[in-house]
Amino acid sequence: MLANLAHQVVRRRWIVIGTWILLTFAGAFAAGQLSKRWFQSFSIPGFPAYVANQETLKTFGTGEQPPMIAVFTTPGKDVTTVPGIQQAIDAGAAQVHKPVRVGSWFDSHNAMYVSKDRHTMVATIYPPGNATFDTKPPVKEVRAALRKTTPTGVTVHLTGRDPVFESQGEAGGPSVLTEALIGGAGALIILLFVFGTLPAVAMPLLVAVTSILTTFLCVYGLTYLTDVSIVVQFLVALVGLGVAIDYALLVVFRFREELSHGLNTDDALVESMTHAGRSVIVSGSTVAIGLLSMLLIPLPFIRSIGLGGMLIPLISVLASLTLLPAMLSLLGPRINRVRVMPQKFVKPHSPDEGFWGRWSRIVQRRAPLVFVAGAIIVAVVLSPAFHINPSDAELNKQPAKGDAGAGRAAVTAAGMPNGLYLPYVVLVRNGASATTLASVADAVSKTPGVAGATAPPSWRTGSAGLIEAFGTDDANSRTARRTISRLKNDVLPQVETLRNNATTKLGNAAGVKVSLGGIGPENRDFVHAVYGKFPYVLLFVLILTYVLLARAFRSILLPLKAVLLNLVSLGAAYGIVVFVFQDGHGSNAIWGIQATDAVISWIPIMIFAFLFGISMDYEVFMLTRIREEYDETGDTSHAVAHGLARTGKLVTSAALVLMFAFFALSTGPGPDIKQFAIGLAAGIVFDATVIRALLVPATMQLLGKWNWWLPAPVARILRVAPSEG
């Protein structure tokens, strides 16, 4: 089939090239239009906290964004008696688009807004509307109004989640185009050392540019069918760059090798497509399977990344199997002309020469020792993953500068609870009388883990009302999870039942509805929504990948080994992310991010979706060549040695290309993109070194002929020829 495709592409090469040129220009136009069409919010339909927050938003105009926290300090004075502070709060709130919701001591006279020594007071200012990537509360304007109107002798700061993020300068990151150029520059340097000639270097880069822009065109069309997350733009640019170059690298590598064996252009293309093209299809399929699994997660945000991301490998494969052969047929032997690197850097070796040839012989002679060494490295790198904490970081673990940092320090110095940054918000519907609200607030305030709760009189409208509660700990902390669980599963259902029993006796048939909202509970719902389904996602990917590889390599044990080692690579990537970001080893020195005690909740699932398939590429590159050698010789040791020797440089080069692309992605704004990019980069490097250079060849050497075992009954199910064991 692939040989026939090669013939058809060569015969119609100008049509193929012209079609891709048109798609590329259309994609460039579409990329410019996408800024207006990205989906920019997180939503978890059907989950209780999200539903409560959406109902609060519908009724009060607020509820999906955390409050900004105004902090007033009066050393030596009772802050509640200082005139003018309430007017300052009102002036700050006036800078926020209406409807704005404010919680303070002046509205409720509740002690939770005041420190025990009564020298510090906080006020919560809730911005209206949904939270999106572009939503930026008017932090500077509110801060300026507070400073201008706060009485003399009172120190005022504005802190909270959004002021802290604003102090980090997250909006100042490089553009997607800049990141792509950084990644492209790194890829160019690597390709120069791999090929040494300008035409050979240009081929993968042209395929990458075409694939990226065509993917943007497809994503643009997808936005008219469903919501697509803004995160996809980073993935298309950087993951697309790495994947497309990797696939093109494999084909060009094989094409030059076949030319060096004396084949003419057409025959070299047929051989390249038959072998390297097959690897590209299998590799692209494994990446697509990982991303397809995201559709099993019941979150539009994650599903849109899966859908948009799945286009990356599919279009990269298509370009590598059509556009690239068409261009190679025009170049032919001229691909080795216009040398830009000295011959000594790229001089080809026979399979038994060079570093990888020598290394393969070392591995085979000492396979048990190499396997043990690799296993020890895996154990060390993977071990931090066992205490991974998928959650947003607590606010006091976030880097904060200037006034936001000073405000946070003032709250801490006053001994006020960390839970005030992300308050719990309880929504009461269908009968939110003052008595009912007071009863609910009293029950909430007595819950372990809650520092205080109140129902401000201004937080009532019609039959609905709100209660604000400060937890003793940050709502994203591990201890707060128990508090959220108590409130959601015990306290609020009980108080709802009691109030309904009371109203029924009074002849009121309408049932009071009490539900827990706020950013913290919604974050926990997000984690449950994602990781509650993760076992099914994992099983789906493992089964599909195993079947695909079993057909490709005609073996039972090889795909099992590949899947297990890929899981090891994934665990190592998690371990590195935990070690660097959650535990803080190096994150502050490199990115100015202190230990967060958490990995942002959506990062682990997305690392899995991309890394499982991408790292499998290298397994496919190696095993395809090893299987080819084994089919020719019937000698496992010879096949492993020659397979590693012939693909070692290729796998290393491909991994370095992706590593540069992901490091470029790590320069993007926000700790979430950094964690995601470093997780992918670390996983790729670990996979190409420890897994592919140590564990894969050592394991195959130890398994011997069992590598190729495929009983006839299984072969019939897979519809392939059986293989001896």
What is the predicted function of each stretch?
Residues V71, T124, F253:
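Short beta-strand segments
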Residues M1-K36, P128-P390, G511, I519-G725:
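Membrane-embedded transmembrane helical bundles of large multi-pass transporters/channels
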Residues G46-P67, P75-G160, H387-N588, A598, ...:
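Structured non-transmembrane domains adjacent to transmembrane bundles in polytopic membrane proteins
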Residues S41-F42, A49, L238:
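Disorder-to-helix initiation segments
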Residues Q40-S41, V79:
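A detector of helix-start/N-cap boundary segments at the beginnings of structured domains
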Residues R37-Q40, A393-L395:
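Short hinge/gating elements
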Residues L22, A30-L34, P45, N53, ...:
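N-terminal cofactor/phosphate-binding cores enriched in small/glycine residues
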